Design a protein with these regions (language model features):
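Intrinsically disordered, low-complexity terminal regions
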Residues: 1-333
Length: 333
């Protein structure tokens, strides 16, 4: 069912609404870019301040290849300027660390509960750097990288992955999950916990997640598939949003895009109160609906609400120049 809704409200009010929306988007994009950059660079700033005092007597090395006894509750902390990073979780109570740098700039320390690897450019050297780690499942993983791809599989513990320029792939994590990148794609699956993602550019795709999820991007499409979360928040300035998953009783789902379409694909037996707002878009619904006018004023002239089932969950969608699609799962379109 396709519904094109008439624009209402004075022209002056509409123009001011557009101006406020553009201002809000510009401010949001600037804040997001600054937040991601600060998060990635903070570790390096702290490292530089303490570098001479803490590591002045430690030699640089070009290669690490060792296996140590390591607790499943331990922390793996890796900070690097560049290089490909691969981390895999396994069932052993030990960690295998393999790292190589043509620049000879690796620093390594380890105990039974914490592993720390640091790498940085020195004396203008260039060259390849790579890391491969196998750690006990359940370990906490922290990665700070300026340039390079990060892949983590089956870690099944808390994860903090932050890059300035590089793709991130995360498959299997539990607990607190934080991901950020300034420029790079993010692909994730099998996540259980509280998930937070900040990105400026690049694509975001997550499959199979439980718990809560919050995603904020500037110029990215957001794809969320096979989710069973009680709370989902996704916002993007110039991308599209797809949410495909369950709607949990008393759950809250909020999806907002300025210039992209928003698609919500949920089971036919879902129970939710659906609220949508759009300026120049249309609503396309697989569900039979009866529109109930919501809050209507000069600043919000096109906001409507309706119930699916008994309306137990809350779904909010908002676009400025995009369409909103409400689809039944499994429906061929």
């Amino acid at each position: 069912m396709l519904m094109a809704l008439p624009v209402c409200g004075p022209a002056q009010s509409t123009e001011r609404r557009i101006e406020r929306t553009v201002e809000r988007i510009a401010e949001s994009a600037a804040r997001m870019a600054e937040r991601v950059s600060e998060r990635v660079s903070r570790a390096f700033d702290e490292w530089d301040r303490a570098d001479d005092e803490r590591l002045q007597n430690q030699d640089f090395v070009s290669r690490i290849d060792t296996t140590i006894a390591f607790s499943a509750n331990g922390t793996v902390d890796l900070s690097t300027i560049s290089g490909e990073i691969r981390v895999t979780g396994w069932s052993r109570n030990e960690a295998r660390i393999q790292a190589y740098s043509e620049r000879g700039d690796l620093r390594f320390s380890a105990s039974s509960s914490r592993i720390r690897i640091e790498a940085r450019s020195r004396r203008g050297r260039m060259g390849e750097t790579r890391y491969e780690l196998s750690v006990p499942q359940g370990s906490r993983l922290i990665v700070q990288s300026t340039s390079g791809d990060v892949t983590a599989r089956d870690v099944n513990g808390p994860v903090d992955l932050h890059t300035t320029s590089g793709d991130i792939a995360l498959h299997g994590a539990t607990g607190s999950i934080e991901i950020s990148t300034t420029s790079g794609d993010i692909e994730a699956s099998r996540l259980r916990g509280d998930i937070e993602v900040d990105a400026v550019s690049g694509e975001f795709d997550v499959t199979d997640a439980e718990g809560t999820i919050r995603v904020e991007t500037v110029s990215s499409d957001i794809v969320l598939r096979n989710l069973r979360v009680r709370e989902a928040t996704a916002s993007t300035v110039s991308g599209e949003i797809l949410y495909e998953g369950a709607v949990i009783r008393d759950g809250h789902y909020d999806f907002r895009s300025h210039s992209g379409n928003v698609t919500v694909r949920i089971p036919a037996n879902s129970s939710a109160r659906f609220q949508f707002e759009t300026y120049s878009g249309e609503l396309d619904s697989d569900f039979p609906i009866t529109l109930m006018p919501g809050e209507r004023s000069r600043s919000r002239p096109r906001r409507f609400e309706f119930n699916i089932g008994s309306g137990e969950a809350r779904i909010v969608t908002e676009t400025f120049s995009g369409d909103i699609m409400l689809e039944r799962s499994g429906t061929s379109r």
